[in-house]
C-alpha cells in the first residue's frame, strides 16, 4: 500500500491533480512501478483507491468540523490496514480508512474506536 495525497502524487509526475478522474491514471502508473494498492487522499474531496484487483473505489467521509488534520493520513492508512486484516475486502478496508482519517481530522487528538465506528456508518463509497 502506498498513500500519497493528490498533491504528492502530482509532484511525482510533474502535474496538478484536483479530481478523482485526474488521479486514477497516475495512481495506475504507480502500480506499473510496483505498488499493489494506491490510496490517494484528496482532503475535503475524500479519497480514491486503485486496488491491485482492478477495483477503483472513491468516497468521502461525512462533512464534520475539521479540528486537527495532524495524523489524519496516518489514521487513514491504519484504518485501511485494520479493515483489510478484518475482512480481506477492499471496500470495507477503504471505508475503514476513510472513517479513521475523517474521524481523526474531526477530533482534537486521534479518534476513538467509537468515533471511527460512527463515522464508518456515515461513510459512503462508490465504484468508478
Q: For each predicted feature, which ranges?
A:
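Conserved beta-alpha-beta core of the PfkB/ribokinase-like small-molecule kinase fold
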Residues: 1-25, 46
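Conserved phosphate-binding/catalytic region of the ribokinase-like
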Residues: 20-128
Amino acid at each position: 500500500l502506498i498513500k500519497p495525497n493528490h498533491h504528492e502524487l502530482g509532484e511525482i509526475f510533474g502535474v496538478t491533480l484536483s479530481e478523482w478522474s485526474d488521479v486514477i491514471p497516475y495512481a495506475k502508473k504507480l502500480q506499473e512501478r510496483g505498488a499493489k494498492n494506491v490510496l490517494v487522499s484528496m482532503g475535503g474531496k475524500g479519497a480514491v483507491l486503485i486496488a491491485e484487483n482492478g477495483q477503483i473505489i472513491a468516497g468521502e467521509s461525512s462533512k464534520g468540523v475539521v479540528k486537527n488534520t495532524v495524523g489524519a493520513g496516518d489514521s487513514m492508512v491504519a484504518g485501511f490496514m485494520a479493515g483489510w486484516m478484518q475482512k480481506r475486502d477492499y471496500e470495507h478496508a477503504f471505508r475503514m480508512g476513510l472513517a479513521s482519517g475523517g474521524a481523526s481530522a474531526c477530533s482534537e487528538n486521534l479518534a476513538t474506536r467509537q468515533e471511527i465506528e460512527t463515522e464508518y456508518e456515515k461513510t459512503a463509497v462508490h465504484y468508478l
